[in-house]
Amino acid sequence: MTNEGLKLPSYSMLDLEGYLQPAGTPAQQIAMKNLAWTMLETYRTPDGGLGSRLSNEWLGEQKWYVQIIPHHQIMYEDSPWLLPLCLTLQEMRVFDILGTYVSPPAEDKSTVWQLKIDREQIGTFFNNYRMGFHLLYCQARRFAIHGNDGDYAVYAGSEKFIRAALPPIAVGSVATAKVIAGIEEEHGPGCMDGILEHYAPFMID
């Protein structure tokens, strides 16, 4: 059977078919998934599992910055933090928003969704993938938002993008410290040390 005849697994918590649209044929979705992985790498999580994160090589090549935020702030259809993101994407004229599951070992073949610039759709995407690693991006790779198991998300792109797409209180070292403190309170001290070390060269002060 060719890829044209396959229906790719979505790995979402709920069936999103009919609410979000697949980004083309299975073959086209696989191509879009491969594009996502040009920005990512796999790594060992603190519990010994295999996860994904934004690649330092990609971040450095693109001269991108990152900002870690609480995942719950973007996973509801009326999340206020999604409003500046939608406005920023509209101003950037980025209309081919894509979302997909990026938890290994499902690196290559899983549904890639086509999303509208809409708080309800974007919030629903982040909510339904909160139990794994997931990525919101566009075909031109002008930005990326990487979600991690419902604990946190990483906004990545130009400093201008990050500052425009998030509330001012969500940007900078003080905001990052608050996010880390909340995660460590739940999962234990030091659980974020590896992630902080990985993203340190690209964080906004």
Label each region the model flagged.
Residues 1-153, 157-205:
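Structured alpha/beta or helical-core interaction and ligand-binding surfaces enriched in interleaved
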